[in-house]
Amino acid sequence: MSVATPYFDQLFADNEDPWAFRQRWYERRKRALTLALLTRPRYASVFEPGCANGELSAELAPRCDRLLCCDTASAAVALAKMRLLGFAHAQVQHSRLPEQWPTGRFDLIVLSELCYYLDADDLGSLIDRALASLTDDGQLLACHWRAPIDGCPQTADQVHALLHQRLGMENVARYHDCDVLLDLWSRDHRSVATHEGLR
């Protein structure tokens, strides 16, 4: 069973940064790795579900023409909206996934610290929706903490294995260590050097 919305509401009830995104070097380093893994300097339309308080969102915003974020916790949505006030092209919605997947096409979908909260059925549904909304050259980036989390139906390793199996896209970039998994899948298999005419 996927983790229910009240769990996330409680996390944000009296804490604007329940995972210490702003304080922990681990989190700052992970965001830097996430951004470095992206093979394009800029994207047309990015979707970041499970945006929490918008710390990663604020670093994705300068890299795209349109940014859509969402979260299931009302307080997180309010915090992310405040964090993104300086970006007119960014929008934050209150929605629960996979049921309330947005309309539109995206050339980048970022699943950061989200998918292990979903059970296998909901994750499968999310993958189907992601595939349907990715552009012909679209990419999907996944980033997850590897240690088991109490109450989560899946681990990072299970999530990334299922993503790799179900997406049917080439894994064009990855970073794995004992703490975190980062994977980028793309419908465009060309490397950064190939894009820039270096090879």
Where are these regions (language model features)?
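A conserved beta-strand element that flanks and buttresses the S-adenosyl-L-methionine
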Residues: 110
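Hydrophobic adenine-recognition pocket in adenosine-nucleotide-binding enzymes
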Residues: 114
